[in-house]
């Protein structure tokens, strides 16, 4: 076991001290919001129906697709990292066993990709705070449920933010529009 994996497992085991029946229910529910980006896709659909957020929703779609291609179709298969429950014995999962590789966390990548896009466009403090809290909770739930290493989640967050920023930069630079928020 390498140095990073040892540190990851130590952190995961510390997080396990938070376990309780109530937390189990909360974390399984929160992680379900991130399954296949369902919550974010539903949010995009809702935003598409509004005049104020329609433009943002279109960019959310583009950023989401770029993120899925980079993280789920390229990086995960290329790295092929085992999940923590496959390495540490005696872990009882509270959710269905994920079948794809662990690195990076797709839930974290998609959540922070969507959050970055929302923060770029939205002027609503309520939407920004709610999206921030949800993204953070989804990422944390993956650790609590022992399905990702902390380094998977951290890198997922970084990949999510970068995929959004790079996509927005590319989209806006083609149109000659500055990336700065008005």
PLM-predicted stretches and their roles:
Residues 1-38, 72-100, 181-182:
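N-terminal transmembrane-helix/juxtamembrane module of multi-pass inner/ER membrane proteins
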Residues 91-182:
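Membrane-embedded catalytic cores of phosphoryl/pyrophosphoryl-handling enzymes
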């Amino acid at each position: 076991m390498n140095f990073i994996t040892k540190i990851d497992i130590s952190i995961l085991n510390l997080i396990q001290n938070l376990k309780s029946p109530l937390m189990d229910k909360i974390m399984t529910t929160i992680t379900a919001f991130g399954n296949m980006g369902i919550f974010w896709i539903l949010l995009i659909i809702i935003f598409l129906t509004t005049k104020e957020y329609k433009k943002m929703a279109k960019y959310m779609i583009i950023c989401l697709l770029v993120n899925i291609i980079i993280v789920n179709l390229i990086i995960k298969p290329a790295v092929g990292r085992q999940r923590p429950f496959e390495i540490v014995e005696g872990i009882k999962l509270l959710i269905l066993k994920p079948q794809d590789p662990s690195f990076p966390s797709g839930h974290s990548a998609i959540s922070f990709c969507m959050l970055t896009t929302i923060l770029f466009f939205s002027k609503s403090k309520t939407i920004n705070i709610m999206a921030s809290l949800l993204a953070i909770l989804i990422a944390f739930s993956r650790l609590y449920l022992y399905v990702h290493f902390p380094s998977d989640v951290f890198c997922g967050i970084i990949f999510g933010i970068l995929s959004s920023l790079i996509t927005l930069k590319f989209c806006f630079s083609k149109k000659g529009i500055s990336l700065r928020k008005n």
